[in-house]
Amino acid sequence: VLLSEQSRKGVLVRIEKGAYYRPKKSVLGLGKLPVYQDEQFRYLTEKLNGYITGAYVYNKMGLTEQVATTITIATPNPVRRFRFRNLDIECVKAYCTDYPDDSLVPYLRLLDAIKDMKHIPGTTGQDIYNRVKSQYFNGYSLPELEKIVSLAKSYPPRVRKVVADILG
């Protein structure tokens, strides 16, 4: 009740049911600043205990030029598709659930790209294979490659096979 009263007064802004934040004032003294997409992503990934993957990340990695309309989050316990603010959110199963910090997330995203190789829009599986091999695997050091191999053990056999072929 107190939070909703403060929300009506403008002291707090409601994100969703039970979640509020205190808006920052801009330099010009204007009211609320817009909530940026990165802040929304951070909030969702912390709430769902996962990391962002899918077509949105594959676009950022340079694997496709298509822009994603749905944001995919890999979580240990997927929930059904929902809408948050102006974003469509889809949750998929995370194959590696016990990563201690966010330093492993780029490797997990790379393994997700290998897993979804045939389903990445606007490109072929062979093209993705060549890009992943040239852009990522050739630039990694031996300890990084060992991390990728250890993380790949929790992925399906097709991912392990592609990683073995690349490292060949």
Which residues does each PLM region occupy?
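Short gly/ser-rich loop at a beta-strand->alpha-helix junction or flexible surface loop bordering the NTP-binding
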Residues: R14-A19, Y43-R85
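Short N-terminal helix-initiation segments at or just after the protein's N-terminus
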Residues: G31-V35, T53-Y56, I166
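A short, charged helix-loop
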Residues: R85-A94, D98
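Alpha-helix initiation and capping sites
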Residues: P34-V35, K47-I52, L104
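Short amphipathic alpha-helical patches
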Residues: S26-L30, Y43-L44, T64-A68, R80-L87, ...
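Short, charge-rich amphipathic segments
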Residues: Q37-K47, H119-I128
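Short beta-edge/loop segments at beta->alpha junctions of small alpha/beta modules
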Residues: V1-E46
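Hydrophobic alpha-helical interaction segments
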Residues: Y95-G168
